[in-house]
Amino acid sequence: MSTTTLTRREQRAKAQHFIDTLEGTAFPNSKRIYVTGSQHDIRVPMREIQLSPTLIGGSKDNPQFEENEAVPVYDTSGPYGDPEVAINVQQGLAKLRQPWIDARNDSEELDDRSSAYTRERLADDGLDDLRFTGLLTPKRAKAGKRVTQLHYARQGIVTPEMEFIAIRENMGRERIRSEVLRHQHPGMNFGARLPENITPEFVRDEVAAGRAIIPANINHPESEPMIIGRNFLVKVNANIGNSAVTSSIEEEVEKLVWSTRWGADTVMDLSTGRYIHETREWILRNSPVPIGTVPIYQALEKVNGIAEDLTWEAFRDTLLEQAEQGVDYFTIHAGVLLRYVPMTAKRLTGIVSRGGSIMAKWCLSHHKENFLFEHFREICEICAAYDVSLSLGDGLRPGSIQDANDEAQFSELHTLGELTKIAWEYDVQVMIEGPGHVPMHMIQRNMTEELESCHEAPFYTLGPLTTDIAPGYDHFTSGIGAAMIGWFGCAMLCYVTPKEHLGLPNKEDVKQGLITYKIAAHAADLAKGHPGAQIRDNAMSKARFEFRWEDQFNLALDPFTARAYHDETLPQESGKVAHFCSMCGPKFCSMKISQEVRDYAAAQAIEVGMADMSENFRAKGGEIYLKREEA
């Protein structure tokens, strides 16, 4: 843990330097590859980890080696992971999906922004220095049209996004020839459908059934298509965002890039401070992954932070503002109903969701039903016009172990299931948010309740944290629950950083949270038996047994930390070819002893085989040539 504390000015300057010097960067001994689809502009990025050969024999002067296959892995870093791409944050990323969106001919550019707030911001010359310069002209569905991936899937259409995803989800595993690498234990998938090969048609069918979503706003053409669903790889979300007391636009863009480098499949911008609109524009124009928001946060800012003053009109304007900027999914707390709020009175920690508490306060102060629930169909109409997915928020999630799985939590979940069906009427894609704080033995019920109540819509959970006693280590306490619920069928895990319950995460906290959750997601994929999930583990184990230290570092989720820990005790280059590590030393290394046992067993087998042949030779009378009938 770093003890260096930077001033606000120093933090901003450091972030600005990061942005100014940003360039495409590969991980150690990795290279960016692209797998092309049926049309030339479907180019799916992957990272290929290059491995060194295995010494199999020969002499000191003439060693014999066997090549090890490169290992392809899923890559969320977009252009930031390609050294061949010139990065310019001021200009934003290339608009990868724009030709696909235009070719469908079901959307049109707007003459003006639909949001009054956006028009006010654009007219304010005082914001020119903060504003992203290359603003997109927003698009919206033509009259009578729907532009959602769910709509296309229901029409039987395989979109370029779906083909892109099918290639991406297969992770290049068809390239692997080694039986050692391809070996995989059968998993326990709790009813998930995990085909050996994911096809574009399978992607289409899962989206059409509502079991998966493709967050892909038509105004975010820079994003690389990805999918969230329990029959696909478990995904991880990272939260970023400024607050009234800390962080700047530069720092949030830096966190975005940093998040994609360390494996964030989506990023949520939870900004609540100044310049929310401008910060979000910079993030969207530079994001290769889907961006989610909680619109009620910004709507609250527009009424000076007074929950009672919120109105449907202010919220609707915020939805239009964010949809036309390109936000890919909205968290909407429409399930916090007036009649559920009293259920939380006997809780130890009450309502811990920020959005949930805002809506509960509004309901109580007006003694009216939640206006998000009352206007839900209008929300769906807006989402259908831009292809904004809905993430139905768990505003009544438990904030402590004591409150887990209570009446309030599951009452809201059942309402979210009802809202899911309404959203599907409008061809709007839906996922369901989940807890929270839940002890291990109570986690599986959350998954089974969600599947039943919400009609198998994808589940997206914050952890859950499995104990409340570890502030500063809640990435661990929640990572345990995340791995379990991912195994049971949760489609996406929202990361928790070491700063959870303590403060706003910095860049290093973001990395720690992401690494923890990538471990949890991968462990869940292994447990489910997701095809190809074990390839990287097998490659690591083989490298470990063969003392290929450089390959072990490079196959790690965090190669830099793995190398640093090794080099703390064996920094010399000779330590990277040694057949031992500092934990056991040369005489007690279990791997080295195992190799010696294997070599001894092989030699013994040869010796026993020779003895058997000798005995057989003597039994035949010691004749060099045998008669035909004796042979």
From Swiss-Prot:
<feature type="binding site">
    <location>
        <position position="297"/>
    </location>
    <ligand>
        <name>substrate</name>
    </ligand>
</feature>
<keyword id="KW-0411">Iron-sulfur</keyword>
<dbReference type="Pfam" id="PF13667">
    <property type="entry name" value="ThiC-associated"/>
</dbReference>
<keyword id="KW-0479">Metal-binding</keyword>
<dbReference type="InterPro" id="IPR037509">
    <property type="entry name" value="ThiC"/>
</dbReference>
<dbReference type="InterPro" id="IPR025747">
    <property type="entry name" value="ThiC-associated_dom"/>
</dbReference>
<keyword id="KW-0862">Zinc</keyword>
<comment type="function">
    <text>Catalyzes the synthesis of the hydroxymethylpyrimidine phosphate (HMP-P) moiety of thiamine from aminoimidazole ribotide (AIR) in a radical S-adenosyl-L-methionine (SAM)-dependent reaction.</text>
</comment>
<keyword id="KW-0004">4Fe-4S</keyword>
<feature type="binding site">
    <location>
        <begin position="353"/>
        <end position="355"/>
    </location>
    <ligand>
        <name>substrate</name>
    </ligand>
</feature>
<feature type="binding site">
    <location>
        <position position="239"/>
    </location>
    <ligand>
        <name>substrate</name>
    </ligand>
</feature>
<keyword id="KW-0456">Lyase</keyword>
<dbReference type="GO" id="GO:0005829">
    <property type="term" value="C:cytosol"/>
</dbReference>
<keyword id="KW-0408">Iron</keyword>
<feature type="binding site">
    <location>
        <position position="584"/>
    </location>
    <ligand>
        <name>[4Fe-4S] cluster</name>
    </ligand>
</feature>
<feature type="binding site">
    <location>
        <position position="268"/>
    </location>
    <ligand>
        <name>substrate</name>
    </ligand>
</feature>
<dbReference type="GO" id="GO:0051539">
    <property type="term" value="F:4 iron, 4 sulfur cluster binding"/>
</dbReference>
<comment type="subunit">
    <text>Homodimer.</text>
</comment>
<comment type="similarity">
    <text>Belongs to the ThiC family.</text>
</comment>
<dbReference type="GO" id="GO:0016830">
    <property type="term" value="F:carbon-carbon lyase activity"/>
</dbReference>
<feature type="binding site">
    <location>
        <position position="333"/>
    </location>
    <ligand>
        <name>substrate</name>
    </ligand>
</feature>
<feature type="binding site">
    <location>
        <position position="501"/>
    </location>
    <ligand>
        <name>Zn(2+)</name>
    </ligand>
</feature>
<dbReference type="GO" id="GO:0009229">
    <property type="term" value="P:thiamine diphosphate biosynthetic process"/>
</dbReference>
<feature type="binding site">
    <location>
        <position position="460"/>
    </location>
    <ligand>
        <name>substrate</name>
    </ligand>
</feature>
<keyword id="KW-0784">Thiamine biosynthesis</keyword>
<feature type="binding site">
    <location>
        <position position="437"/>
    </location>
    <ligand>
        <name>Zn(2+)</name>
    </ligand>
</feature>
<keyword id="KW-0949">S-adenosyl-L-methionine</keyword>
<dbReference type="Pfam" id="PF01964">
    <property type="entry name" value="ThiC_Rad_SAM"/>
</dbReference>
<dbReference type="GO" id="GO:0009228">
    <property type="term" value="P:thiamine biosynthetic process"/>
</dbReference>
<feature type="binding site">
    <location>
        <begin position="394"/>
        <end position="397"/>
    </location>
    <ligand>
        <name>substrate</name>
    </ligand>
</feature>
<feature type="binding site">
    <location>
        <position position="589"/>
    </location>
    <ligand>
        <name>[4Fe-4S] cluster</name>
    </ligand>
</feature>
<dbReference type="InterPro" id="IPR038521">
    <property type="entry name" value="ThiC/Bza_core_dom"/>
</dbReference>
<comment type="pathway">
    <text>Cofactor biosynthesis; thiamine diphosphate biosynthesis.</text>
</comment>
<protein>
    <recommendedName>
        <fullName>Phosphomethylpyrimidine synthase</fullName>
        <ecNumber>4.1.99.17</ecNumber>
    </recommendedName>
</protein>
<dbReference type="GO" id="GO:0008270">
    <property type="term" value="F:zinc ion binding"/>
</dbReference>
<feature type="binding site">
    <location>
        <position position="433"/>
    </location>
    <ligand>
        <name>substrate</name>
    </ligand>
</feature>
<feature type="binding site">
    <location>
        <position position="581"/>
    </location>
    <ligand>
        <name>[4Fe-4S] cluster</name>
    </ligand>
</feature>
<dbReference type="InterPro" id="IPR002817">
    <property type="entry name" value="ThiC/BzaA/B"/>
</dbReference>
